């Protein structure tokens, strides 16, 4: 028997070039009657940056900045999802449940795999690369790590 896709985790970097991947995710969800989890991972600062910030910014200000960043990411994810839902409302009216949005703290590759396991995902979808200069030349390091370490199938969508 062929495997059933019940849950799809789409690891979204909130770039403006995510349309192709989002279209594919929503198409797969519609075809398979799958639940969609749209997630974004907030990468922690490295030790040097963290020490510098801790030396110059109070904990109260740091917490406020983090809260603002999470609010901004939530807003961007909701906007991205709303735009797709509006654009494809007719085609997506058959989705059993509205996509869930999730923001997690941690290294992206590890967070993607953790969420996929926690949510019993059958498929992870992600873009081929991030928006950094060096990563534009090759497959993104996050996608590369997930591809090589995930026990869940990974679909990588090229950014055009």
Language model feature labels by segment:
Residues 58-77:
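A short acidic, glycine-rich active-site loop
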Residues 5, 120-122, 134, 152:
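Local beta-strand N-terminus motif with an aromatic residue
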Residues 154-160:
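Short, flexible loop segments at boundaries between secondary-structure elements
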Residues 123-145:
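Glycine-rich, Arg-bearing micro-motifs that act as flexible, cationic patches
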Residues 39, 100-104, 155:
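General small-molecule cofactor/ligand-binding pocket signal
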Residues 2-63, 91, 118:
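Small/aliphatic-rich secondary-structure junction motif
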Residues 1-3, 82-124:
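Structural beta-alpha unit
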């Amino acid at each position: 028997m062929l495997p059933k896709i019940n849950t799809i985790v789409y690891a979204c970097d909130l770039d403006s070039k995510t349309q192709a991947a989002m279209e594919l995710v929503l198409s797969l969800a519609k075809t398979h009657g799958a639940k969609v989890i749209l997630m974004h991972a907030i990468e922690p600062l490295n030790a040097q940056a963290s020490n510098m910030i801790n030396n110059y910014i109070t904990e109260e200000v740091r917490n406020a900045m983090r809260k603002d960043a999470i609010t901004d990411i939530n807003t961007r994810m909701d906007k991205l999802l709303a735009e797709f839902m509006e654009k494809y409302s007719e085609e997506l009216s058959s989705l059993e449940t509205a996509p869930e949005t999730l923001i997690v703290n941690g290294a992206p590759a590890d967070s993607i795999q953790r969420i996929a396991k926690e949510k019993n995902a059958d498929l992870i979808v992600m873009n081929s690369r991030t928006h950094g200069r060096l990563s534009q030349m090759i497959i993104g390091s996050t996608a590369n790590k997930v591809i090589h370490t995930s026990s869940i199938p990974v679909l990588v969508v090229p950014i055009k």
